[in-house]
Amino acid sequence: MSEPKKQPIFFPTQSVDNFFDKPEEIVQFANSLEYKTAQSGFWPGKRTEELHINHTLFFKSFLTRLFALFFDYSHTKLRWSDVGMYFQKTSAFDPKDKNNILNTGLIHQDGNFPLVGLVYLTKDACKDSGTSIMLPNKKYKHRPELADEKVRLHKIPQEKLTKKDLEDRKKLILSLNENFEESIRFNNKFNRLI
């Protein structure tokens, strides 16, 4: 895990409910796509290919809608580049116990980008399965070996994790959590953009 970088704030942190006009159609579209586990180990679960490759219309309409939250198109011309956009599926490690520490996401930084976000598209998801924005606490230490361990664990499909892998994930979560404190929490609500 790299040291947290202070970046200028181009886009404020926000939450927008009912982002898509017809979210069920978006879910249907997402479910029609192929998903793959990360060979690189940089993210959990499974993702589609980048959407700009074969789904340009959706890609452009999403970005147009997103940037309309920040810019008045009658006064602004926008161009974008280096945009990564995917659908991603993750699942609980222990669906019977939502409080199992293994169900906690791994603290991470989404690269050095001015804007990152997501839209929750799982109906009736546990609201506590949302997203937390974390800040380094007073105990924070730069520990690059934790990033290596995270990558190793993400490379293994969830259904193939051994008991030792799950124990290693638990240790990793505890090690990461001791360095950060929650600053903002977004609950998982269907069709919410954060």
What are these regions (language model features)?
Residues 2-105, 130, 137, 144-160:
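Non-heme Fe(II)/2-oxoglutarate
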